[in-house]
């Protein structure tokens, strides 16, 4: 968040499973639409927050399975853990806040052991301020009421969350997705970067707390669970800041951005024109997003008159522009782009997608910029990522590529110098 110098125009706080991530969308099209929009229009000065019931361990597993962007802040384990940045640095003040609650894991484990219908979830899901169980179908509501009374008699003040008809989570009363968001908003206000607008996004009763916070916009995606929609009808039906979208998952989030006029809602993936590249219309971050969309579509064989586009991009490179390939080879950038003609349609019919993450633009001197980002490629089930740096310069009112340097990311599944990685 160090890049922020003023109040972010928008902070999106989104659940992951069945909200940001559509597990029925095997091509991840809605997620990729959101990714392009965020990196193009929002990454520079806004905040992306994921709020999930997953533990940090399961969150990292999801990142390996789906093309998730890197959030600025991650709230995990049903709001009991908060971390910042790519390194997921824990918020120790939040931990101390929960430590001060009437909470004792040993007492929770002692009392829950009296219920044979409860089975502890794997160790990865047992956290400092969360104890999680599976429960026999149909027994959740009665058990949670009885367990709540037992824990209250033992001096604890807890929330017991029954979800999906099979999960029971016990957390401190002061924890939860809503409480974590309220804490986060106060923290941002104290740091002078309180967001102008906040959009909360969810699909299940786990997320209901997010929609109860004053002055926060909310979207319940079209595929939301009946329990959440029932909660809305009883608690938020007349709240004009909370809508039930007509689109699923990430598409519903984009729809809400437009509905509330929170900023641009046209994803670059919905635009087919790549040639409008004057400085008045594009910045270096935009150029990166658009180029790699072009690159993806070219290799998928989806662009008519692709040679015209290749010629245009080639002309946007200095004659001496250079590419430092992750293999260690040094190549002419103009020649590399020209050779893309040979790759047209080589990924046709395959699950081939390209996206960029953490696009950061830095002004060096007037008329020169450095753009750093992660460039990802996925072909079928194989993913590769390079840490990428591009140097741009201004020439005659146009944005010109000067240098591209790529090195393999530690997250990349494939780090050999195979020939499929071009740029």
Swiss-Prot record:
Record's catalysed reaction(s): sucrose 6(F)-phosphate + H2O = sucrose + phosphate
Top-level taxonomic group: Eukaryota
Keywords: Hydrolase, Magnesium
EC number(s) recorded for this UniProt protein: 3.1.3.24
Cofactors named for this entry: Mg(2+)
A GO molecular function held by the record: sucrose-phosphate phosphatase activity
Transmembrane segments: none
Keyword Hydrolase: yes
Keyword Magnesium on entry: yes
Entries under InterPro entries matching the protein: HAD-like_sf, HAD-SF_hydro_IIB, HAD_sf, NTF2-like_dom_sf, SPP-like_dom, SPP_C, Sucrose_Phosphatase, Sucrose_phosphatase_pln/cyn
Pathway it works in: Glycan biosynthesis; sucrose biosynthesis; sucrose from D-fructose 6-phosphate and UDP-alpha-D-glucose: step 2/2
CDD domains reported for this sequence: HAD_SPP
Annotated SUPFAM superfamilies: HAD-like, NTF2-like
GO biological process terms held by the UniProt record: sucrose biosynthetic process
Similarity comment text for this entry: Belongs to the sucrose phosphatase family.
Function noted in UniProt: Catalyzes the final step of sucrose synthesis.
Complex and partners: Homodimer.
Protein name: Probable sucrose-phosphatase 3b
Organism: Arabidopsis thaliana (Mouse-ear cress)
Lineage: Eukaryota, Viridiplantae, Streptophyta, Embryophyta, Tracheophyta
């Amino acid at each position: 968040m160090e890049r922020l110098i003023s109040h972010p125009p928008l902070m999106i706080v989104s659940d992951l499973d069945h909200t940001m991530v559509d597990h029925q969308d095997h091509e991840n099209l809605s997620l990729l639409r959101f990714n392009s929009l965020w990196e193009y229009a929002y990454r520079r000065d806004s905040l992306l927050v994921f709020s999930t019931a997953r533990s940090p361990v399961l969150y990292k597993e999801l990142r390996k399975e789906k093309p998730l962007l890197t959030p600025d802040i991650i709230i995990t384990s049903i709001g009991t853990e908060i971390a910042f940045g790519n390194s997921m640095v824990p918020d120790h003040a939040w931990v101390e806040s929960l430590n001060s609650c009437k909470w004792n894991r040993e007492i929770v484990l002692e009392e829950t052991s009296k219920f044979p219908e409860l089975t502890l979830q794997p160790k990865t899901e047992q956290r400092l301020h969360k104890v999680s169980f599976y429960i026999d179908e149909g027994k959740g509501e009665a058990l949670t009421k009885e367990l709540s009374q037992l824990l209250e008699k033992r001096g604890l003040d807890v929330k017991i969350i029954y979800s999906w008809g099979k999960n029971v989570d016990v957390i401190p009363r002061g924890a939860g997705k809503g409480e974590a968001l309220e804490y986060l908003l106060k923290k941002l206000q104290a740091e002078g970067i309180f967001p102008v607008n906040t959009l909360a996004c969810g699909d299940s009763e786990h997320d209901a707390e997010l929609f109860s916070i004053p002055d926060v916009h909310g979207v319940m995606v079209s595929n939301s669970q009946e329990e959440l929609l029932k909660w809305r009808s009883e608690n938020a039906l007349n709240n004009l800041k909370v809508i039930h979208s007509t689109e699923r998952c990430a598409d519903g989030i984009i729809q809400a951005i437009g509905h509330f006029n929170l900023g641009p809602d046209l994803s670059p993936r919905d635009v087919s024109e790549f040639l409008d590249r004057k400085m008045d219309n594009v910045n270096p971050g935009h150029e990166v997003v658009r180029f790699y969309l072009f690159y993806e579509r070219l290799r998928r064989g989806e662009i008519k008159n692709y040679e015209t586009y290749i010629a245009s991009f080639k002309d946007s490179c200095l004659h001496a522009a250079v590419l430092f390939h992750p293999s260690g080879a040094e190549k002419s950038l103009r020649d590399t782009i020209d050779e893309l003609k040979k790759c047209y349609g080589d990924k046709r019919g395959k699950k081939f997608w390209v996206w960029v993450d953490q696009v950061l633009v830095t002004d060096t001197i007037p008329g020169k910029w450095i753009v750093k980002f992660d460039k990802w490629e996925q072909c079928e089930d194989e993913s590769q990522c390079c840490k990428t740096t591009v140097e741009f310069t201004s020439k005659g009112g146009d944005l010109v590529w000067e240098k591209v340097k790529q090195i393999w990311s530690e997250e990349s599944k494939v780090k050999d110098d195979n020939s499929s990685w071009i740029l």
